[in-house]
Design a protein with these regions (language model features):
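Active-site cores that bind ATP or allylic diphosphates and position pyrophosphate for catalysis
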Residues: 1-235
């Protein structure tokens, strides 16, 4: 039976680093407060080496100022466009958007300054920051309650392979031959393998990836690569 382990030294939303086991919120705060730099500063690397597995820290160091850091406010203009284009009566169709939250969004959207600022503005005792942030992401990505019900009813409709080791090609081949669900390795060939609901889920996932890619492309000045263009990773 699954059970939770209480974190020692720091709380879930603690924003200060501790000697070890700091919260994700604290680690994000450190990363987001770093002044513009082409590389991750050595003192920050030293701090994070006590908080993160070596592999995770290595990824941050290698991707710094190339594809990270990315924060919610980087999606502010995209979200503002979506909120301005949505009529009041349509907001409630999105996952987690209640009538109360819809009303607050419409009443306050002219005060929108950034993703984070708007979450704080909308927050009440009944509507937490996390709930609002999640709801706004659903609006941004056009994820409706109807979508979620369809995905839940169809459970696991496919498996998309993102990468594999070259010496285990036989495992991938066996999966394709014997799996009870479609195994997707190329997006362009997925349409004929999937049900309408599974295709919709995969298309939404690809759209979210492309949206994220467009943000890092604009922020860091790197070429945009769509999800359709990305190749499976072989190591």
């Amino acid at each position: 039976v699954p059970f939770t382990l209480k974190r020692e030294f720091s709380g879930y939303h603690d924003t200060e680093l501790h000697d070890c086991s700091s919260s994700a919120s604290a680690i994000r705060k450190v990363l987001m407060n770093i002044p513009a730099s082409p590389y991750l500063p050595k003192n920050i690397s030293a701090q994070l080496s006590e908080q993160l597995p070596p592999g995770s820290l290595s990824i941050i160091q290698n991707e710094w100022n190339f594809s990270c850091p990315v924060e919610a406010d980087d999606f502010s203009l995209l979200l503002k466009y979506r909120l301005l284009s949505e009529p009041h009566e349509s907001l409630c169709k999105y996952q987690d958007v209640s009538e109360e939250l819809s009303n607050r969004i419409i009443r306050n959207r002219n005060q929108f300054r950034s993703f984070g600022q708007f979450c704080t503005l909308l927050k009440t005792k009944e509507l937490t920051y996390s709930r609002i942030s999640r709801s706004l992401l659903h609006i941004l990505l056009s994820i409706t309650t109807e979508d979620m019900h369809a995905y839940q009813d169809n459970s696991c409709s496919y498996a998309r392979i993102l990468g594999f080791r070259k010496e285990h090609t036989d495992v991938l081949r066996a999966m394709k031959d014997h799996a009870s669900i479609p195994i997707i390795t190329k997006l362009g060939k997925s349409a004929s393998l999937l049900s309408p609901e599974a295709s919709r889920m995969l298309n939404q996932t690809s759209f979210a990836s492309d949206l994220y890619e467009s943000v890092i492309s604009d922020k860091f000045g790197i070429p945009f690569t769509s999800e359709q263009q990305k190749q499976i990773i072989r190591v």
